Each structure stands twice: as structure tokens, then as C-alpha cells.
């Protein structure tokens, strides 16, 4: 298994790569889209959960890629697009330009065939708020396959501890490197399902 890394190490590698002018979010989104396309049953609707940070941008890029492949995709953007970071805002603009459908709340009775969890990733360091927890609980109650991006939402990426009741993923696709919280025995490893890594071509130094 590839080595795991702290959030600080992953962030540092990301910053160094972005400083060269290389854009990573489109690469992450394309990798997630390929992952879903290889596993989704024909005709199933994909719901991409896009949170307020760059994890949400990865989900938006994945949604745009899947739509371009001909899949039926919806985006749930509970916190709106106004406060998105620059790269995530660019991903949202691409989703809009592609004609994608964006919801702020779930449609009554809607149940997707597969969920992309791009709510928080490695950025979560405090317990899920009540509204976010309610959304996670709804997703878990659907009992449909979930692909988590980087880390299942509701997990502390460094410690692997639960920050509420986390998303229960079937797969977790980590970008750049696997967070330590997915390797250690505990809620993080239990919630992540099958853990895979796409380095996006970023070189990580081995963790100590």
C-alpha cells in the first residue's frame, strides 16, 4: 500500500505544484469521472455533492466530465456558489456552461444511483454542522454507492476520528496522497471503503 501523509504534507505538495502554474482540479475531476463511469450501472443518475471549498470544485469537475460522457448528473450545492474559492468557482462556471442542473436542496423523493461526496475532503477539522449532518444522514440512508473524494465527509483526515456521523463510502479516491486518517484503524478506515490514490502527477516525499 502507498504511504500515507499528513494534511500539511498534502497541502504543501499541492501548493508547490500550483505555484508552477499547473491546474490540478480538472485532473482530479477527470479522474473521479473515470472512476464513476467504470462502475455505474447503465441509466443510473449521479448526484455530485459539492461543498464550499475545493473538494466541491473537484466534484463539479467530475460532474461536468460525466455529463460530457452522456451520464445523467445533478449537482447539489447546499451553500451556494457565491463563496467558492477561485478554482472551484471556475469549475462551477464550467458546469453551468455545460448546461448542468444545480440544486440547493434535495428534491422530495429523489434517490440517485450513485453519489460523489465532494463536501469537505481533507479540509474538515470540526464537527459537522446540523444541516450538513442531516444531509450526510440522508445519503447514508439511501444505501447507494458513494465515491468519496480525498476523505469521506465527517472524518478528520489526520486522526481518522469521526466528526459526527460520517459518509459511508464504497470507494474513496484520494488525490496527491492518501491521508493518514484513512490508514489508521478506526472510523476513517471503516468509512472509506476501498481506498485508491491518484497522485495527479504530484511527487510526494515519503511520510516519516
From Swiss-Prot:
(6S)-NADPHX binds at residues 54-58, 121-127, 150. It catalyses: (6R)-NADHX = (6S)-NADHX; (6R)-NADPHX = (6S)-NADPHX. It comes from the Bacteria. InterPro entries: YjeF_N_dom (IPR004443), YjeF_N_dom_sf (IPR036652). Its cofactor is K(+). The keyword Ion transport does not apply. It is an enzyme of class 5 (isomerase). K(+) binds at residues 55, 117, 153. PROSITE patterns: YJEF_N (PS51385). This is NAD(P)H-hydrate epimerase. It comes from Achromobacter xylosoxidans (strain A8).
